[in-house]
Amino acid sequence: MKNMTKLSLITLALAASSSVFAAPKTFVYCLEASPSALSPVLSTDGASFDVNALPIYNKLTDFEDGTTNVIPSLAEKWDISEDGKTYTFHLRKGVKFHDNKEFKPSRELNADDVVFSINRQFDPNHPFHKVSGGNYEYFIGMDMQNIIDKVEKVDDHTVKISLKVPNAPFLANLAMDFNAVYSAEYAEQSLKAGKPERIDTNPIGSGPFQFVDYQKDATVRYKAFENYWQGKAKIDRLVFAITPDASVRLAKLQKGECHAMPYPNPADIENLKKDPNIELMSQSGMNIGYLALNSSIKPLDNQKVRQALNHAVNKQAIVDAVYQGAGQVAKNPIPPTMWSYNEAVQDYDYNPEKAKALLKEAGFENGFDTELWAMPVSRPYNPNARRMAELIQEDWKKVGVNAKIVSYEWGEYLKRLRQGEAATSMIGWTGDNGDPDNFLNTLLSCSAVEAGSNYTKFCHKPFEEVVLGAAQESDKAKRTELYKQAQVIFKEQAPWITIAHSTVYFPVRKEVKGYVMSPFSLHNFYKVDLADK
């Protein structure tokens, strides 16, 4: 019996030592573009949020995996006043922050961190408001500065947010990545050290992964956070390998150099389905690919010109050539899977003669010259912007519009779009919270012009009144009717050429377990594991 006991102890010791010295699990994701920033409050694009938000930070609320359902996160629960204008959040206890060589947290997350994180974007007099450029495009684009009245600490674990007006999607908005909660203590220490921008370049959060380093245009590396409040991740290391070319991403995936990749070329889909080492996940995208027509640049300030450019584009031919069976022609600025989608809206048919007639009415019988900006990266809503640009260029030439194709590196491209430099630009959007407001307000409102997320500079008061009215309405049926009205106004004004809604494909290697696709086309690897080959 004693010998058996000794043997058992030896076996247990060996098992323990083998687990201690087991090779760390490293998950490599082939990311499609370099992050525009390492701070989610300074970002708007999905590639950046994949890198700078989901691994590092938490929000007050979150979305249930694979759905648009809002669930508690840093706030365990909340109360809403009868008039819908006061939200009281009760914070989770025991949430720890990361550390690094320059910062060791002395306390757990509390109300000070929540108040700091919101007020940094909301209050122009806040000491961190202008740090790192102070461009809070998403916060302003969502009209948060006109929704929020004040943010108050009630006690260490209670925060009260008062609104100027009721806002139906407010809880969903708080679950979006631009509302990440930062460490106020880290910010204060960074400010005292004369390095306030450190909170954006060497990030500290409370999320499942801890930032290690960023090699520009190459890799972003993380390690699992041992003290994460939801439990340590199953993988030990997370690496984003920046790989803009979809063909190169695929080659890396097939060779096992990365475990997952976004946005494969449509032409590769059939082969991926047959690959025994790959699981090809897919879902209908909550997205829209479109061509923004900048109404602040002549002659695009003329509604008839914008309508003519719509009639001049053969969208079905584009969908066939670029999406290759993985997309459908778009007529509205929101996807057909979203509530309030207006089926009754009539699209601009492909009609070059009608386009010429409208151009003549607008005083451009002989056409005009313009620029056509094409994204340098694959996105869920546009797998090949260069090819799409070439097709549109050919279509416009038939009606006398000569377009020069222009492109820049992704971060520079977005920066220039925000500044309003592009006359016409390919871009798109994947919904972030499941609400039509996230498309119609964020991309097309007057406040979005100020924020920089409305690349058309379209500011049309009748449209604005309907969209803001819908956001303040709590009755979903009434909101639906208002959003349907907004889609009619949008189509008449033609600030975009709506191109397509896509099917989103996500190939992963067979050893990847536990990954759930997000309706927002964001990629969260907290629950992912790697099985033995």
Predicted regions, residues:
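N-terminal lobe/hinge region of extracytoplasmic solute-binding protein
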Residues: 30-82, 119, 126, 204-205
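Aromatic- and charge-enriched surface segment that lines or borders ligand/interaction sites
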Residues: 76-127, 160, 299
